[in-house]
Structures are given as structure tokens and as C-alpha cells.
Design a protein with these regions (language model features):
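Structural alpha-helical scaffold elements that stabilize or flank donor/cofactor-binding regions
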Residues: 125-126, 173-174, 213
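A glycine-rich helix N-cap at a beta->alpha junction
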Residues: 71-86
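Short glycine/proline- and charge-enriched loop/turn segments
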Residues: 20-28, 184, 239-243
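Conserved beta-alpha-beta core of the PfkB/ribokinase-like small-molecule kinase fold
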Residues: 132-203, 227-228
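Conserved phosphate-binding/catalytic region of the ribokinase-like
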Residues: 3-4, 194, 198-318
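Conserved phosphate-binding/catalytic loop of the ribokinase/pfkB sugar-kinase fold
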Residues: 84, 94-132, 137
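Glycine-rich phosphate/adenosyl-contacting loop at the front of the ribokinase-like
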Residues: 1-74, 248, 314-318
């Protein structure tokens, strides 16, 4: 079944100015609507490395929902566990400046509780055959608890990302049970109640190494934009993964692609540095296009062997 991804589908509405962006003023430009959401982007990124993931999610029972499923199927994603329900998708509205960075955004999250029905009915068959699990840690708490229960039952590693750190902080105890947690510099500051603005990669690497020991987090990666990413593990490894310099067109989905690369690498036997390097390549391929996801790659381009899943999982305390 490969990597199993669990989370929400969003419709992204993105506005781009045709001239210099004027904050608080009227800006002529273009507006695009695309399929998005951290988990939806993640599962398509994994599929674009020809790894045949499975997606547990919800869509609206509308034509847009059907289009989401059709596109994922075209990319060889297993969509058997996507349920169509009223108001099953979220919406993300974002405005970009001329440099491709988000200057304002607002989002409406969907109600993901129907996913619990899927986990109750099919959780055993899904988790038994999975190579690993990837989810947004800020999902409904009952969903997160069910995921970690099934992961422990079948000995599967869980990789966690975040879309709303304020909610994710309430799930902080689950991070000890994650195989690896990935977030950005600002989110790491919220997690550890500190301000990391202006920190160098070397400084943040050392801070992260200290905090994950104290918090008993197995592995953690923090992205720092153009400064790359830093990582640390509970067994004492830490380091910096430099960014790849590319022309920035649209940063949407770059973090999701990075998380996909880390998940892919650690699932299929790579070191944490090698996994970060895969994430960096996928992220760079997203930034230089207007797409939310990476282009097609072959597993061999990253030295991957999909038959060699890591399969270890920490003991959980629910």
C-alpha cells in the first residue's frame, strides 16, 4: 500500500498582482483556483516520485470534489478511502507579492470527523499493509489518537507536519510518538515558546538539538526558507541541509514537498540528512513553478528502494 497520507483537501484561491503590490490598496492582477491542502499536496508529491501512496481524506459531493479524486487517480494515488460528504473540503485564500511570497491569507478548515468512520471500518487493513503514515498533527484529536493507536498496533512509523501550529501545540504530547516531525522556523518557535527570528542555521541547529532531548522527540526537522533546514535526533545527530538556489515564482506547496521528501527518505532507508536532501530537491522544483506540487521523478533519481521500508515505531502513551 506504500505511504498512507491522512488529512484535508483544500481549494486554493491565489491572487497575483500584475504590477508592484500595494498593501491595503487595490491591485490589478490574476486569480487562480487550484486543488491544495497540505495533505493533498503531500500525497501528490509522493505519487510524483512513482511511489503509489494511499490517501485517507474527504471531498465535497460536488464536481470540484470529483475533479480532485480524478486528478489524484491520474497520478496513481489510491483514492479508495476518500469519502464524499457535504462541505468536505476547506478553502485557502492567499495574496502574493511580486516576489512570489504570501502577504495575506485566510483559510476555512473542513470538518474531518467523518474520517473516523473510515478508520473504524478500514483502519486495520490500511495500516497493516502501509509502509509508513503521514498526517497533519493538527487534525481532530480523536483522529490523531486513532492514527497513533493503529500505528502502534501494526508497528508503523508516523511522520507529522502541521498546517495550524496553534492547534498543533495542543497535540504536543503526540510528538514523542512521531518517527519525525517537520515544521518551519516560526512554527518551531511557537512549539518551544521562543522567538527564533534572526537565528542562523548553526544557532537553530544547536537549539533544536537541546530541545528535542528535553522534550523526548525522536527526530525533528525545521525549515528556514532560503537558509535551508536544520535537523536533530534524540540519539545525538544534528546538522544543516543547505537550500538549493532557484528563481522563486510561487512558494505555495514548497514546505509540503519538503515534508514529502523527508517522509519518503526516512520511510525507505535513508539517513535524516539524505532525507532532507530529497526534501530540498522536491521543494526547489516546486518554488520555481506556479504549481503546488513537484514534477515527476523516478525513485532511482534519489537512490530509493521502495521495498525497504523502515518499519520501526516508538512506544506510544495515549
Amino acid at each position: 500500500m506504500g505511504i498512507v497520507v491522512l488529512g484535508a483537501v483544500f481549494v486554493d484561491i491565489k491572487g497575483y498582482p500584475s504590477d508592484v503590490y500595494i498593501p491595503g490598496g487595490r491591485n490589478a492582477g490574476r486569480v487562480e483556483q487550484v486543488h491544495g491542502g497540505v495533505s493533498r499536496n503531500l500525497v501528490e508529491d509522493i505519487a510524483n516520485v512513482e511511489l503509489r501512496p494511499t490517501f485517507i481524506s474527504l471531498v465535497d459531493n460536488t464536481g470540484i470534489g470529483a475533479d480532485v479524486i480524478r486528478k489524484l487517480q491520474d497520478h496513481k494515488v489510491n483514492t479508495d478511502y476518500i469519502r464524499a460528504v457535504p462541505d468536505g473540503m476547506g478553502t485557502w485564500l492567499a495574496v502574493f507579492d511580486n516576489g512570489g511570497d504570501v502577504v495575506a491569507s485566510i483559510s476555512k478548515r473542513p470538518d474531518l470527523r467523518p474520517i473516523l468512520i473510515t478508520l473504524d471500518e478500514h483502519g486495520d487493513e490500511i495500516f497493516r499493509d502501509a509502509d509508513s503514515i503521514a498526517l497533519e498533527i493538527d487534525c481532530d484529536k480523536e483522529i490523531v489518537k486513532k492514527v497513533f493507536y493503529l500505528a502502534e498496533k501494526y508497528g508503523k512509523p508516523v511522520f507529522a507536519a502541521v498546517s495550524n501550529m496553534s492547534i498543533a501545540v495542543e497535540r504536543r504530547d503526540f510528538l514523542r510518538s512521531c518517527h519525525c516531525f517537520v515544521c518551519n522556523q516560526q512554527e518551531a518557535g511557537i512549539l518551544f515558546s521562543e522567538d527564533y527570528t534572526g537565528k542562523t542555521p548553526e544557532e537553530l541547529r544547536d537549539i533544536l538539538a537541546h530541545h528535542i532531548q528535553a522534550a523526548e522527540i525522536s527526530r525533528m526537522v525545521v525549515t528556514m526558507g532560503e537558509q535551508g533546514a536544520v535537523y536533530a535526533t534524540h540519539d545525538g545527530q544534528s546538522g544543516i541541509c543547505p537550500a538549493i538556489k532557484v528563481d522563486v515564482k510561487d512558494t505555495t506547496g514548497a514546505g509540503d514537498a519538503f515534508f514529502a521528501g523527508v517522509t519518503i527518505g526516512l520511510t525507505y532507508g535513508k539517513s535524516i540528512l539524505e532525507a532532507c536532501e530529497i526534501g530540498t530537491r522536491l521543494s526547489a522544483s516546486v518554488i520555481c513553478t506556479s504549481e503546488n506540487v513537484c514534477p515527476r521523478f523516478l525513485p532511482s533519481e534519489f537512490g530509493l528502494e521502495p521495498g525497504s521500508a523502515c518499519g520501526d515505531q516508538l512506544t506510544l502513551e495515549l
